[in-house]
Amino acid sequence: MVVRARHTVPDVERDWPGFVDMPPVLATAMMIGFIEQTCIQALRPFLSEHQRTVGTHVDVSHVAATPVGMRVTAKVELIDVHGRSLVFRVACFDEGGLIGEGNHQRAIIDLARFTQKVAEKAAKASADSAG
């Protein structure tokens, strides 16, 4: 991934004013999203068409700033499997070296079942707020 302005701290979320005047470097949230995307893509060939994975835990340090225009790479290694739970060792690098590392956990889900549960949760919340 090449860091663009939209990946920087000031552009993460304009509704959160604390970010607006921060330096324009790769946002931690974007680095985590890139790690998740890399894990998703690494797992895709091993899942059925009815399965996906969802992030369940992130323990990653962001140790160096990356300016706009630099290329970032993510390396992920599946280090543990417990049933549907998958644990990855992850690291991100820019052209200057290591920028982040840690562990990321994902869970394998059945897409239809998961989507149904989310719809039920949304319907209940809507009914509760209306009542």
Give the location of each predicted region.
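C-terminal output/interaction extensions
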Residues: 105-131
